[in-house]
UniProtKB/Swiss-Prot annotation:
It comes from the Bacteria. This is one of the proteins that bind and probably mediate the attachment of the 5S RNA into the large ribosomal subunit, where it forms part of the central protuberance. In the 70S ribosome it contacts protein S13 of the 30S subunit (bridge B1b), connecting the 2 subunits; this bridge is implicated in subunit movement. Contacts the P site tRNA; the 5S rRNA and some of its associated proteins might help stabilize positioning of ribosome-bound tRNAs. It comes from Picosynechococcus sp. (strain ATCC 27264 / PCC 7002 / PR-6) (Agmenellum quadruplicatum). It holds the Pfam family Ribosomal_L5. One of its GO terms (molecular function) is rRNA binding. GO terms for cellular component: ribonucleoprotein complex; ribosome. GO terms for biological process: translation. Transmembrane segments: none annotated. Belongs to the universal ribosomal protein uL5 family. The keyword RNA-binding applies. InterPro entries: Ribosomal_uL5 (IPR002132), Ribosomal_uL5_bac-type (IPR020930), Ribosomal_uL5_C (IPR031309), Ribosomal_uL5_CS (IPR020929), Ribosomal_uL5_dom_sf (IPR022803), Ribosomal_uL5_N (IPR031310). This is Large ribosomal subunit protein uL5. Keywords: Ribonucleoprotein, Ribosomal protein, RNA-binding, rRNA-binding, tRNA-binding. Part of the 50S ribosomal subunit; part of the 5S rRNA/L5/L18/L25 subcomplex. Contacts the 5S rRNA and the P site tRNA. Forms a bridge to the 30S subunit in the 70S ribosome. The gene is rplE.
């Protein structure tokens, strides 16, 4: 099954970015490497049900089973010991990555209340973009009646872009709704 965003990238984005940045080789053009979806669960140590529901939700949203992240060090202030589960994470690559990004851009982000676009400043200096989502209900796969608590998640989009400007141009061409500042 060919992904809409992947064919868009190959057919129109690569020539546009090659012309815009003056690349001499098509392999210089920035491309998506992976998308990491992460959810930190502070209450996971005391509430096993929160972990189960988060695993179920993330696997429904991404189409891939998440891995449980564990504490690297014990922190007494947070009442966690080394090795305790503290969150869940999914790393998406290739077909699932393009499918998820397409659903995020065209279905999920427009469903955010008072949505005026996402911040164009959340790049890390190397062309990678991170955004936080406050509630999982923006994804159409999640049924309102089946959730026990509203939880957010962090989404990181990792690209091969060398600068923020290249990464921003790549994501804007893919249809990412950046806010006009």
């Amino acid at each position: 099954m060919s992904q809409r965003l992947k064919t868009l990238y190959q057919d129109s984005i690569v020539p546009k970015l090659t012309e815009q940045f003056g690349y001499s080789n098509v392999h210089e053009v920035p491309k998506l490497v992976k998308i990491s979806v992460n959810r930190g669960l502070g209450e996971a140590s005391s509430n096993a049900k929160a972990m189960e529901s988060s695993i179920k939700e993330l696997s429904t949203i991404t189409g891939q089973r998440p891995v449980i992240t564990r504490a690297k060090k014990a922190i007494a202030g947070f009442k966690i010991r080394e090795g305790m589960p503290v969150g869940v994470m999914v790393t998406l690559r290739s077909e699932k990555m393009y499918s998820f990004l397409d659903r995020l851009i065209s279905l999920a982000l427009p469903r955010i209340r008072d949505f005026r676009g996402i911040s164009p400043k959340s790049f890390d200096g190397r062309g990678n973009y991170s955004l936080g989502i406050r509630e999982q209900l923006i994804f159409p796969e999640i049924d309102y009646d089946s959730i026990d608590q509203i939880r957010g998640m962090d989404i990181s989009i990792i690209t091969t872009a060398r600068t923020d400007e290249e990464g921003r141009a790549l994501l804007r061409e893919m249809g990412m709704p950046f806010r006009e500042s």
